[in-house]
C-alpha cells in the first residue's frame, strides 16, 4: 500500500511538471502587426515633453488603432531613457509584434506635427495623419486635454528637472492602472490609496494628475496590447536590482511592482500562508491529504517557472489556471477561515467563492480561535522556553483576545451573511457558534405599510424576531447554541494515528450535526464513523 501512495505522490508532482519538458514542440509563429514607435536621440527637455504630450494624445485619440496606441505607450514608457532607440529594443523580444522605430528631431511650430529624421522613410502624408490623430481628442475629456489642469500642455519645460517631474508623474499613473488591468478591469482604474501614497512621497505631482477618463483609456490600451505588457514585464525585472543605489524611475517601478507581483494568485499564496504556515494539527485530517500533495506539486511547479512566474496574470499565461483555489477547495476553505481570525486585512479579500466549503471554513475559524495561544514547539525549543513560560504566554494571549471584544459578547465572522453581519449574545469565555438559520436574519423590507411604519423601529423589530425588548437578553436561542461546543482534539504523546484520526472525525461529525440541526430537524443524522458527510448548509449565494 505504501508503494501505491508513493507512486501517487510522484505522479501528482510529475503531472504538474510534465509541461516543462524540453521536447515540447515549438509553437507556430503567428502573423505579427507592425507597431511604429517614435524615438528621440537627443535629451532636449522641450522636445521630450512635447513627445510625451503627443503620445498621450495618440492613446486618447478617437480614430487611433490599437497599434497606434501600443506604439505611443512604448514611446511613453521609454522617455526616461537617455538612449530611447536602444531601450525600445526590449520590446523587440516580444513575439507579438514587429517594432518599427522612427527617429524624429522635433515638432513643427509647437504643434503635434513631427519632424522625421533625414534617414526616416516616413512620408509627408503619414506625418499629417499622425497630427490629425493627436488632435482628435474625445469629448469625454474636459478642455480637450488629458490633464485635470487644462494649462499643463502650455507650460514650457526647458529644464530637465521639470520635464522629469511631469514624465515621472504620468508614468507612475500608467503603472498604477496596470496593477488591476488584468484581474479587475471593471473597478476604478486608479486606487485612491496608491495615488495618495505616491503624492505624499513626492513621486506624483498633483499638477500633472490625469483625468479619470484618461486613466481609463490608458488602462484599456495596456490591457489590449500584449507587446506593451511584455515590455513592462522586462522593466519590472530591471527594477529588481540588488543594489540600493537605483535611479529614481526604477526605484518607483520596483515599488509599484510589488502590487503587480502574484496578481491573480492571492488564493494560492494565502492558502500556503494560513493553511500550511500555521502548522496546526488539523492538517492531519485524511480529507486534506490529497490536496496537500497537490499543493506540494504546485509549489515545485511555481519554482520551475523562474522569475517570470510572478507576472503570470500580466502575461496572460495559461499556467495561471494551475494555481486556482478550485484545485484544492478544502485546504483553501480551511485557510480562509484561519485568515479571517488572524488577519484583519482579509476583510478586503473576496474569498467567498462558489467552491468555498462552509464546514471547512468554520473548521478554520474554530481552529484559529482555539490555537491563538498555542506555542510552536520547534521555536519554543530554540528559545529555551520552559513549560511555565508556555503556560504564561498562553494565558496572556487569552486575556488579550477577550479584552478586545465587547463585554459579554462574541463577534460572528459569517462570510455568508453579507450586509447582515451582526453579533450574537453569549458569555465572553464561550466559543461562538455560527447560525446559518435564515429565520434569524434581520430584514428591513418586511413592513406592513409604505408610510411611517417603514422607518426602522428597534423595538418592533426585536418583537418580530422574538428577541425581547432592546437592551434585554436575546429570547431566541437555537438548538445549536444550547448544544455543547466540543474542543478540537489535540494529539498527545502515545496517541496513535488511528486514534487521533477517529477523534478528528468525531469532532467534524459533531460540528456538522450542530450546524445542520437548526436547518432540518428531520434530516438523517446517522453517519458512518469512517465516512463523514459534509454537505453545504443553506444557500451560499443568498
UniProtKB/Swiss-Prot annotation:
Region (Ntail): 404-542
Ncore: annotated span: 1-403
TM helices/strands, residue ranges: none
Amino acid composition bias (Basic and acidic residues), ranges on this chain: 440-468
Annotated stretches, region: P protein-binding 2: 403-494
Keyword terms: Capsid protein, Helical capsid protein, Host cytoplasm, Ribonucleoprotein, RNA-binding, Viral nucleoprotein, Virion
Residue numbers binding RNA: 180, 194, 259, 349, 353
Endpoints of the signal sequence: none
Record's subunit section: Homomultimer; forms the nucleocapsid. Binds to the viral genomic RNA. N0 interacts with the phosphoprotein (via N-terminus); this interaction allows P to chaperon N0 to avoid N polymerization before encapsidation. Interacts as N-RNA template with the phosphoprotein (via C-terminus); this interaction positions the polymerase on the template.
Protein name per Swiss-Prot or TrEMBL: Nucleoprotein
Organism: Human parainfluenza 2 virus (strain Toshiba)
Source organism phylogeny: Viruses, Riboviria, Orthornavirae, Negarnaviricota, Haploviricotina
